[in-house]
Amino acid sequence: MAEENQVATEEQQTPFEMQIQRIYIKDVSFEAPNLPNIFHQEWKPQLGFDLDTETREIGEDTYEVVLHINVQTTLEDSNDVAFICEVKQAGVFTIKGIEGIQLAHCLAAKCPEVLYPYARELISSLVNRGTFPALNLSPVNFDALFMDYLARQQAEENGESTTNTTLN
């Protein structure tokens, strides 16, 4: 009995461990289809921002997480596309000591939280190299996005209608 309690206690006290193995650019694209004509228009940009993540297990306790960010900027007056920037920032993470919803939270929120500053800097650099005014993307609350996702999943399981939450 004492041994069973000791084993159960040791299992409960397994420490959570997340290690970054590698961070890399998986795909990047920058398009400015209306250059140089767009430089003669008044700069009143409308920013479209789309964010998504993709996760896959690539080994025991090892996961690749890819953060997809698509930024499209159009001019308010003409609706001409100023630029489109698509980035897939990826990382390989070793995650031990958690499973289930905690693992899902780590993969959907904590790992993208690590990747986002890299993607944001890359997008800013690409926009700058296109000679457009500086683009500083706001921080993203990945924990809140994950909680929203869980709430929508729960509502769908209960047969309730849901509305999509979009980042703009």
Swiss-Prot record:
Location, primary (coarse class): cytoplasm
Keywords: Chaperone, Cytoplasm, Protein transport, Translocation, Transport
Stored InterPro entries: SecB, SecB-like_sf
GO biological process: protein folding; protein tetramerization; protein transport
Cited Pfam families: SecB
Gene3D superfamilies noted in UniProt: SecB-like (3.10.420.10)
Domain of life of the organism encoding this protein: Bacteria
Subunit composition and interactions: Homotetramer, a dimer of dimers. One homotetramer interacts with 1 SecA dimer.
Function in brief: One of the proteins required for the normal export of preproteins out of the cell cytoplasm. It is a molecular chaperone that binds to a subset of precursor proteins, maintaining them in a translocation-competent state. It also specifically binds to its receptor SecA.
Protein name listed in UniProt: Protein-export protein SecB
Organism: Glaesserella parasuis serovar 5 (strain SH0165)
